[in-house]
């Protein structure tokens, strides 16, 4: 259910874009994201930091898109979010000395430090690559291509990378 809720605003964005335009879709994305955040809080009495940060960026970039009637703002949101994710991963590892992925998962999964480091860097590079791909597709290809990439391409890439990470973790997990 939680994964469906996380994906719901993206589905709303895609549907509204195809029915109307990028501006209605941006407004719908803001509203759907806010509703999911409220529902999550009411249902679980907790909202993850990533969800809150993502919502704030959706609200900011979506509002700028609507206010200035300029789709470039909503297109930048994806790259900004992915860049923040990459920065958080790299800062946790190189400044604070413990990979963020390890902080999130080490209660359930036990891996050697080298594996946590590799996994953390791999995800940071993945997010940077997705952010760079977003810039290219958003600003050099038609808007409809970008919308499909945002909804299906990035989602598919993330699922594949998650699966590959799971395989990598399974190879080194000390609990199996």
UniProtKB/Swiss-Prot annotation:
Task of the protein: Plays a role in cell envelope biogenesis, maintenance of cell envelope integrity and membrane homeostasis.
GO cellular component: plasma membrane
Topology of this chain in the membrane: Multi-pass membrane protein
Gene name for this UniProt entry: yciB
Localization annotation: Cell inner membrane
Coiled-coil boundaries: none
Main location: membrane
Positions of transmembrane segments: 22-42, 50-70, 81-101, 121-141, 149-169
Keywords (A to Z) from UniProt: Cell inner membrane, Cell membrane, Membrane, Transmembrane, Transmembrane helix
Organism in which the protein naturally occurs: Sodalis glossinidius (strain morsitans)
A Pfam family this chain is assigned to: IspA
InterPro entries tied to this protein: YciB
UniProt similarity note: Belongs to the YciB family.
Name of the protein: Inner membrane-spanning protein YciB
Family matches, as NCBIfam families: ispZ, PRK00259.1-2, PRK00259.1-3, PRK00259.1-4
Keyword Protein transport set for record: no
């Amino acid at each position: 259910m939680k994964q469906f809720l996380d994906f719901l605003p993206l589905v709303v964005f895609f549907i509204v874009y195809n029915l109307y335009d990028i501006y209605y879709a941006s407004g719908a994305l803001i509203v759907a994201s806010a509703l999911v955040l409220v529902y999550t809080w009411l249902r679980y009495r907790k909202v993850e930091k990533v969800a809150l940060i993502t919502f704030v960026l959706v609200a900011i970039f979506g509002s700028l898109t609507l206010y200035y009637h300029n789709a470039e703002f909503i297109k930048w949101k994806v790259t900004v979010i992915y860049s923040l994710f990459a920065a958080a991963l790299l800062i946790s590892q190189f400044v604070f000395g413990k990979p963020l992925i390890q902080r999130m998962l080490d209660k359930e999964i036990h891996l050697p430090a080298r594996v946590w480091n590799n996994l953390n860097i791999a995800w940071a590079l993945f997010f940077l690559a997705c952010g760079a791909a977003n810039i290219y597709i958003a600003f050099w290809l038609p808007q409809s291509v970008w919308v499909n990439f945002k909804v299906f391409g990035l989602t598919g890439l993330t699922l594949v990378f998650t699966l590959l990470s799971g395989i990598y973790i399974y190879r080194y997990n000390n609990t199996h």
